[in-house]
Regions:
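Short acidic low-complexity segments
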Residues: 1-11, 371, 376
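Adenine nucleotide phosphate-binding catalytic loops in nucleotide-utilizing enzymes
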Residues: 131, 137-144, 158-159, 174-286, ...
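Short acidic/histidine-rich motifs immediately flanking catalytic phosphotransfer sites
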Residues: 10-15, 103, 381-384
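Structural beta-sheet core signal
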Residues: 84, 124, 162, 182, ...
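Active-site beta-alpha connecting loops in nucleotide-dependent enzymes
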Residues: 259, 283, 289-358, 365-371
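A glycine-rich beta-strand to alpha-helix segment
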Residues: 371-402
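Phosphate-binding loop of NTP-binding sites
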Residues: 7-11, 20-164, 168-178, 233, ...
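Glycine-centered, small-residue-biased loops immediately flanking beta-strands
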Residues: 158, 327, 384
């Protein structure tokens, strides 16, 4: 559709809200500034929307979209009619936001540019803290300092819920002086998640032991993997912190249908299952592929599109190690997300790095889309799982590949 300064003149908005993806050169943003119209980051809008509600803000380098979606779904299935605004489409709702009539507001808190410091939360969830968005932050230490400020935003009556499997993150939370509840698979946490085998490969289950000693069975019928069981545990902890019925909350979580682009099944063709996933950071990739490895497919094949030159440059060795559980890896060109190319920072460079980390692994770099579909038709076999991964337009590859094979028959 495109953006046009004339839109601002026609609409005459009271305020313009921008996401982190909007550059200062955007014509509508420039026109708003010329007219002295207030310009708010997304998080300031979230803060305004949350006034009068009990606000649950979910943050973390990974898992915040899934966890906030789980919290919103859980509260809704408990008939509490929450409002929510999340960074992904919640399956079963076909939207990323809703204005409910209940007392709770669930907000996904974006740390990418520090704007989550505008929020005024009652409960904060932090799933993890790692090096990312190094186009904005100078170091991991600066990221941790910013998260500490974010966790401090909860008032004296508020609570910080944090994954304590990383003791440093738990220590950071406690340094704020706020009430902290830790969760994780380690028995030292306040809330313990014990994953167990489940008869359906695409499902996951765990036993959650709360601080009062009560245990609850949690079953997730989409989004496999221990990382998603931890996300579900975080949601259950939120219910417990809010004083809600934990058993009813665990039951409600079983109705979670997933988040679009988080291990979303695209389709099946010729014995091949195609899944799409938003993972674009080495830790996310590792977790998703570890979960995929346990699903019983002949091979786990991956098409990966790096997202941002700056991220690839900063984390190239971590990316090189991230694909251990992929049997076959196909790399396509970097999705710039508005960045200018960095000399030498390319998908071909990443291919060389992966080969160095995993000698003998099938790694290909394919620059063109038609060449990609042709290459995949040769690489992917019946019985394989094909995962398209990345935060860019790689999401279109799955449907295109299915169409390609359909028309080829």
């Amino acid at each position: 559709i495109g953006h046009d300064a004339a839109t601002i003149d026609a609409v005459k908005p009271d305020v313009v809200v921008v996401s982190t993806a909007i550059p200062e050169t955007n014509p509508e943003l420039m026109r708003a500034r010329e007219l002295d119209i207030p310009v708010w980051p997304r998080a300031k809008m979230l803060s305004e929307l949350g006034q009068g509600y009990t606000t649950i803000a979910v943050a973390g380098t990974h898992g915040k979209t899934t966890t906030s979606s789980m919290v919103a779904t859980m509260l809704d299935r408990m008939k509490l009619d929450p409002s929510f605004l999340i960074g992904g489409i919640v399956e079963g709702y076909d939207t990323n936001g809703r204005n409910g009539q209940g007392e709770y507001f669930v907000a996904e808190a974006d740390e990418s540019d520090s704007s989550f410091l505008y929020l005024d939360p009652d409960v904060v969830v932090v799933t993890n803290i790692e090096a990312d968005h190094l186009d904005h932050y100078s170091s991991l230490e600066e990221i941790e300092e910013t998260f500490a400020k974010f966790m401090s935003l909860v008032g004296e009556e508020g609570t910080v819920v944090v994954c304590g499997d990383n003791p440093h993150v738990a220590e950071l939370a406690r340094s704020t002086g706020r009430r902290v509840v830790t969760y994780g698979t380690d028995a030292a946490n306040d809330v313990v998640c014990t994953p167990h085998a489940h008869e359906h490969a695409l499902e996951g289950a765990c036993t959650v032991t709360l601080p009062d000693g009560a245990t609850h069975e949690v079953v997730i019928k989409s989004n496999p993997g221990t990382h998603n069981l931890l996300n579900a545990t975080a949601a259950l902890v939120v219910a417990w912190v809010l004083g809600l019925d934990a058993h009813a909350a665990a039951e409600a979580l079983s109705g979670f249908a997933g988040v679009r682009r988080r291990f979303t099944r695209v389709g099946d063709i010729d014995g091949i299952t195609v899944v799409d996933d938003y993972g674009h950071h080495p830790t996310e990739i590792k977790a998703t592929l570890a979960a995929a490895r346990g699903l019983g497919f002949k091979n786990v094949d991956v098409v990966f599109q790096p997202h941002r030159y700056s991220r690839l440059q900063a984390l190239v060795d971590d990316f090189g190690d991230a694909f251990a559980d992929a049997d076959k890896l196909v790399l396509i060109d970097v999705f710039s997300a508005g960045e200018m190319p960095i000399p030498g920072v390319t998908s071909k460079m990443l291919a060389d790095t992966v080969r160095a980390h995993h000698p003998g692994k099938s790694v290909s770099y394919v620059p063109g889309r038609m060449q990609l579909l042709e290459a995949l038709s040769d690489i992917v076999e019946p019985g394989d799982l094909l995962i398209t991964m990345g935060a860019g337009d790689v999401t279109t590859v799955g449907p295109e590949f299915i169409d390609y094979l359909t028309n080829k028959e």
